[in-house]
Each structure stands twice: as C-alpha cells, then as structure tokens.
Amino acid sequence: MKLFFKRYSKYLKEHYKSFIVVLFSSLVVALSTAWGTYLVKPTLDEIFINKDTHMLKILPFLVILAYLGKSGGMYLSAYFTNFIGLDIVKKIRNAMLESLLKMEMDFFNRTKKGELIARITNDIGLIRASLSNYLSESVREGLTIVGLVGVVIYQSPKLALVGLVIMPLAAIPISKIIRKVKKLAKSHQESNAKITARLSEVFNNVEAIKISNGEKLEHKAFVKENEAFFKIGIKNIAVAEISSPLMEFLGSIAIALVIYLGGNEVIRGHISVGAFFSFITALFMLYTPIKRLTRIVSNFQEALVASDRIYEILEREPAIVDGELTLNNAIHTIEFKKVWLAYALDNQERYVLSDISLKFQQNEIIALKGESGSGKSSLVNLILRLYEPSKGEIFINDQKIESITQKSLREKISVVTQRVFIFNGSVAENVAYGLEIDEVKIKECLKKAQALDFVEKMPHGIESILDEFGTNLSGGQRQRIAIARALYKDAQVLIFDEATSALDNHTEESVKQSILELKQDRLIILISHNPSTLKLATKHVKLEHGRLTEC
C-alpha cells in the first residue's frame, strides 16, 4: 500500500487544496454523526424523563442541524474526491498511451491488443475507485469511528472496554481474508483482460469469421473464457464478502454483552437511561463504518493489483533507445552493412534477414523482389527503425541510424502498404494526417493519386467524413487515399509495399506515372509481385529466405 501511494503521490500533491476540503468535510460528517448519537441522551433524559419543554423546542433543530452538517459534508467530500479521481485517471491514461506509443513493434507483436486495452480502461477504472471513492470513504469513516468511539468512551468507559474489544479480535481473520482477496483479484483482472483480448480479436476479424463460418467456433471459445471469468469472480466474492458477516457476528456478541452489563448498570442507577441509549446507539452506528472500512481495504486489493499492471507499462523502457541527432538534410543514402534480424518465436530466435549488405541512393527506384516471407517488409521495418538489427549496422547519410531521432527519420519517409490506415475523420484530415491542412495541396495530391474524381463526387468533397477503417470506401479508393497521404508528406523516401494491389489497370498506370514524376531528388522503394510495376525500377534487389540473391 505504501508503494501505491508513493506511485501516485505526484498526482495527489497537485490536488492538496481539494484534499483540505475533503478532510474538512469528512470531519464535519464525523462530528455531525457523533453529535447525532450524543443527542439521544438529552432526548431521553431531559424530554421523556424530566419533561423539559424548553429542551423539546431546541432539540429538533439540533437534530436537523446535525444531519444538515452530515449531508453537506458528504456532498462536498463526494464531489471533490471524484474530481480528484477523474483528473488523476485522465493523466494516468494519457501517460499510459504516451508510454505505449514509445514501445518497439516487437512489444506489440508479443502483447495482445485486448490486454493493453484492458489495462488502459478496466485497470485504470479500479485506480479511480481507489483514489476517489475509497480514499474519501476511508478518511470519512475513519474520522466517524474516532467521533463515535469518543461518544462511547464519554458515556461509559467501562462499557466501552467491552464494546470495543471486537476490534482487535477481528483483525486476525480479516487480514487473512484480505491477503486471499489480493491473490484472487490478480487472477480476476487477468481473466478480464483475456475476455477483452478475445472480443478485440473477434471484432477485428469479423469478416473473416463470417466467410469461414467460424461463428460457432468463436462463440464456443468466448463462452469458455467467460465461464472462467465467472468462476474466478464468484470465488473472489465468496472470500471478500465474508468480512461483513464476520464483523456483524462478532459485533452482535459485543452488543449482547453491553446490553446485559449496561442494563444492570441502569437498574443499579450507575448510568442514566439516556446515557445508556446514547452509548448503545453510538456503538450500533460504530460497527457500520468499521464494516465499511473493512470492505474498502478488501476492495482496495484489486486496485493494488491494477496499479502493478499499469506500472508494468509506465515503468517499462522501450527496447529501441531514441537517438539525439536531428536529421535536417535530405536522405541521400541508406546503407546496410552485414545486417541480421531475428524475431522471437516460441521463445526461440528465428532469423528473417541474414548478412544483408546493400546501399540505396537518391534518384533511384528500387524494386524489392521475393516470395512472401522472404524478408522484404522486414528490410523496410529496419529503415523505419521499427525494429533494431540483431547484428550489423544501418547508416543514413553515413550516420548510424541509432544516433538519429526516430521523429526526424520518419518525417523523411512515407510508406504505403496493403493495410491502409483510414480513421474516422474528413478526407482532408486523412490525407494531411499529422500535418497542417492545405486544401490546394490536398487536391493536388489526390489528383496525382487518381483519387480526386471520386472524392469530388462525395457529398462534401474533401470535407466528407470517412468511416473508421474507411468502410464507406472501396479497397481501391482506400489505397488511393493512402497514396495521396504519402505524397502530401512530401518525403524524400517513398516506400510502396504492394500499394497498387487493389487498383484497376487504368488507375494503376496513372499512379505509376505519378511515381515516375516523383523520382527526382527522391529514393523510391517498390515492393510488388506485379511485373509491370517492377519495370519502373532502376535497380533490382531480390531476397530469398532472408538472404540477398540479386543486388
């Protein structure tokens, strides 16, 4: 728990003024609650027994005042703690995504997307509960316990000893329950992440599932995951919910003893009826915040586990360390010197590129040839520094690639692949992605990509909204938008990875002509199985099983 608050202390410090309000309002709630129980004594002794009419006129207002203070304090406490919780969660979520976006591609290849989504949504939700609800309730209930204990001791120190003995007796079984809950909470969150990963996989591949008649297979797999989640959840509840009944039972024993001993004290005249009922009311009310605190500590175990899962990401350093040199000049040369690249597969390294030595230069059009899996895309990934070579070195303009900042490197490179990224936004926003919108330039790039004609026929032209993944476009239209985006970036290195595979012959010829026009002062890399596209190349590079066979 100490580590938990240490991790979030920098966020909590930003809200110290709000915490002062929370502390003050919680104190008002505690005092109002204690005062309310104390008022039982004058109600019975002064009004019902002594028939004091003056007190009869005053006491109802005092009761209203007590509950007004309690209600107002609870509202202020709830509002400010939720404000703190929401703000901290917002900042942690921002920090998590920032951290994730710095990770190397190998991290994303090894981690299920649903697992990451679960951490950035579900796990953070548990942190919010701990930093807002649990924190405020702990302060409020803790102060309430102090106030009620004060009333209990004030009314009868002797009976207080009997009534409060329950606290240390309950500590041993409660601590064992809490340790068990923490262990189950970890399994529960991991199971929840598996469900999220399964759903993410299904929704991302729903078309393939339908085509392959895989609905029943996927449903069966999901039912299995869901059943496991249910069983762990029930087990968690079965353990966590023991604490409240246990406190109720032990509390009932203490109250029974107090009634017996206190009744004798009243009969002997050692304590007034009002004082005894004030005591018993405070004692009854005391067990409620104790039970709530016990439940909070139990529920807090989930937040501790969630915090560990969140900080696994926040404290993880990217495997690819960014360089310090900003690439200001145009890219003139890209050189590979004895480069090897291995991917981890089933805890074993498998080389996808072996002993690659070659050089690309400005004003060249390079054709990367080879069968699927020969290493063409892996070569491109190394140029973009999405992966680090296992052995060997890569140079950009005779500078080691690892010395160059990733941002400045990627600003000089545009890539168009078969997997086109279209997000929910206007055509203009998709083409100018990450850059300022210049309508004239956007239309020029759309024209070169043979996309302007169909865009202008859309309801709002370049301001027309595209659906997520571009589902309101054909495959060829999506590819042309991607080509226009690459052209808009005006990069010195253009990489086309099967970028014209979804285009008809006429459109493909027009796009190829645009590529030829871009050759001047640029380096263009073509990955294609289409012989007519490969004819554009001035240099051919062939890969077989990760090795160069033609250069």
Which role fits each region the language model picked out?
Residues 49-55, 61, 151-165, 235, ...:
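Helix-loop-helix
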Residues 1-33, 48-62, 77-81, 85, ...:
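Membrane-integrated ABC transporters
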Residues 14, 18-29, 61-69, 133-187, ...:
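Transmembrane helices of ABC transporter permease
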Residues 105-106, 122-131, 135, 139, ...:
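An intracellular "coupling" helix at the cytosolic face of ABC transporter transmembrane type-1 domains
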